[in-house]
Amino acid sequence: MKGALLVLSLAFSLLANAAAPTPEDRLSTVFQAIEANQPDVALKRIDALIQDHPNFRLAHLVRGDLLLARGRPLQTFGNVAKTVPQEKIDDLRDEALARLRAQRQRPSEGRLPRLVLQLHPQQKHVLVVDSGRSRLYVFANADGRPQLVADYYVTLGKNGIEKTREGDQKTPIGVYHVTANLPRGKLADFYGAGAYPINYPNEWDRRMGRNGHGIWLHGVPAALYSRAPRASDGCIVLANPDLETVGRYVQVGLTPVIIADEIEWSDAETVEAERKSLAAALEQWRAAWESRDTERYLAHYSARFSSGTQNAAAWAAHKHKVNAAKSWIKVGLSQVSMFRYPRERDFVVVSFEQDYRSDTLSNAMRKRQYWVREGARWKIIYEGAA
C-alpha cells in the first residue's frame, strides 16, 4: 500500500495551510498517514472525510484500497472489484493525478503569471485556469499586480480545450470576464451551487470564426463531490464548496477569467518590463490621437486591423475625415487592464475607460483593444467598445 500511494502522499503534503481544511487538505493527511506506515490512522481519517462528504468518490476509492491492503499488497492505485466499470476507475485515477500534478508543480514564492500584466483598481481579483493541470487559480489585485490567494481543482471539456464551434464539447482558450451570477435556486441540480457565465465568444473568437455559447463556471449535482478532469460539455466545473468560495471573489462585469493551456510563471521584474513596454505604446497612441497628426496616429494600427465593421483602409479614411474637422482633441484614459492572450505570441488585450473631448463632441466609453507586436513595435489589430 505504501508503495502504491507514496507519490500521492508526497504531493498532497504540499497543500497550502488553510484556516479550515478543505476536503483536498484532509485527503492529503490520509496520504501522509499512509506514507508514515499508519494504515489505521489513514483509515480513520478517510472514514471521517467520507462521513462529512459522502459524495467524494475519490475518497471512497482510497478507502477501498486501504481495506484491500490489509489482505494483500496493492500493485496500483484503484484496486476494486471488476464489476465496477473501468471507465469510472480511470476517471478517478485521472482526478487523483490531476490533483497530484497541481500540488507538485506549485509556483515558487514571488513568481507571477505572465498572462496578467495589469489589473485596473476596481478589479479585485482575476481567475486563471491552467487546463493542463485542471486547476483554477485566484489572484488578488495587489496594486495592479496579481497575488496568488487560492487554487482549486476543475473539470473541463470532454474533448479538451480550444473551442471552435457549437457542440464540440471543448473549453475555450482566451481572455474573458464574468457576465452574470446565476444562483442555485434558478438552476437545475446539474449546475450545483450556482453558475457564472463568461462572455464566450469574445471579439477575437468571432474574428477567428469561433462560435457556440453557454460557457459557464458552475458546480456539480448534489450526488457528486467532483467530476473527472475531462467531463463537461465545455464549461469550467468546480466542487460546490469550491464554487461557493470562488463566488466570493467574483464581481459581475469586472472579474477577468483567463483560460490557458498552461500558466507561464515569471519573475516580477520581467512582467513589469513587459507591462511598461505596452503602457508606453498605449500612451504614444493616446498622445498621437490628441495631436491630430492622423498619420502618426494611424502608425499605431496594424495592416491587419479590423474594428469588426471596418478594415485598416476604411478605418484610415474615416479617421482622416473626422480629424480634419477638429480644432482640438483631448483624450483621457483610466481604469486600464492588460492581459496577455493565451496561445498567441506577443498578443495583449487592453481595456480602459476613455474620455474623449473635442470642439464638436464629448464622449465617455469603455474600450477594448487587441495589441500585437510586429517587429519592434506594438500595433493595434482590433478596437471596439468593451
PLM feature spans:
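Short beta-strand edge/turn micro-motifs at domain boundaries
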Residues: 364-386
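Alpha-helical segment of the N-proximal tetratricopeptide repeat
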Residues: 21-48, 52, 284-287
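Exported/periplasmic cell-wall-interacting domains
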Residues: 180-283
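Surface-exposed, charged secondary-structure patches
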Residues: 122, 320-368
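Gly/Pro-biased beta-strand-loop elements
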Residues: 104-215, 220-226
